[in-house]
């Protein structure tokens, strides 16, 4: 049967070529780049090809087979040593394209690796590897704001509820973008450094084996007697098909399997006594914690001791080889090597790079290769370094030169970090986007609000006194306690589904101005087959691992009680004009206000005499409209006539929602947020806004949604609240998605209101 070859995408090809060039220059394999090539089980061809070219760049002569296994052999005669690592990791493949343009997926492997694997994909950024490109995508999630009013919202625990959004609105648009059934899908979360020297990211436990082996292969020589083969196999998650093929082709006298060690049945991966990152190399045996001195595991243990490499012997299942027919036998001298990981087979699986450096040293000692000095400062395994490489630039970086001013502003504001109570960086980002004349007139009040007044402030003026309000803050977490074991206890800032963030990487933003990577820990028992998510609670504390084992070590990282946390953010354009990024709520509103100020210009008072405008970028909206309440109280004696609160219209334009509430479509215009939990716009004013929009050919929608808006706190002082926004789906998730056409419409409308209301 003719095998399916999946073409290399341009992004992956660029990564692979750069890695090959680095190897050819003598710099060794560029693991930081290679680690970003998707390698879903059964679809490892791109990574396998890159590994093959990297080996060739080292002057080796790699071989391959019908399953895309890659291996190199040096030396001759006996014994034949075989060292193997697998390339693949779990993921998905497109299984259906809906008429509405969403992609359905099937898991690879088809059985769920653990009880939370699918749950941790909901509302997460992803990438679809087509034959011609890599497409940004996001798995759909339930809107946080709409869920409380739902009868039976999706549980977000089963693959039947997974939909992938690439920004298409029809099956034809999907196919026009080059996507099709059988394209592999991976989570798009680059590795990050956790604490000082740990690393976390999707597939970390599946990458570490081939990363160590590729580094060792770059120095492979004939120093050891006999024959040595280093192999990179495919489809290990699909029953060890590549390993089965390799052992059929290349019988060996002794073998080391390097990578993820499978815990025997009945032992949970999170067992308290298990080795932790930083404890050294793991040597896998079939039982106990002590290897026999006469077997290969015992020999490796003795070798590690002689090299002063920390190690532990642990019980481990042999690498899986399933399928039809009898599997080839493992060599009698067989051992496994790995390193401890936390949160295995989750998007935040974590290991210590120091352990991985030790693993590479042990393999080199086994092969009698010279052992280089490797430290955290010069670490070939620091995959997180790749986040600032040119080839790894987000699509938005590559199109900035041709992007509209609105898109440039939105990108700058969404990538600023600032949870409620910690908005300084966002204030500075807004100021940086304002023109010089506006920046000079802007003030920060006692509540941290950014305030810009324009036009006539004289009493008795003929024109209206209008306020345009958007909030600066975003949801997140705050450190409430540093535990004795170094973990952080944190509380929620704002409301959201915890499962969108637990089991994922996070950033601790310290008072010293730097960020420390961490992992939001999953609930206890998550690794058990019968695990059920606990009921949603905003008051239950969460815990964060930052790579330390004591409170003192955590404090040495600069972390203190009161520091705040967010997820790492990346601005991800989808098809057409859609954009997915955490904090579109309310950085879109902030952007609309900035664009309006630019459009009005410094001569507004002369062009529109008698009118007074105030633009307020507020703080603390997500925790109770705090900044808006402070500003409204401060101007209560001379309350403005109208406040236009510019905030998200949480939309049901999603396969995860019913259309009974919040029926507004992305791409069809701004929305008059006539009804929400905090306010009802006066019907006459709603009609007036709609009429003005129609008269000026500005696309407009109107409706009812959930959530509150800043304008509600003004009404007690006599101000009318006319709330407006733009449709957004997957609210308070990592993939909040909007259409920039709606932002343009909103900006045009706020300018019109500023001059003609």
Language-model features, listed with the residues they occupy:
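N-terminal hydrophobic/helix-forming segments and targeting peptides
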Residues: 4-9, 14-757
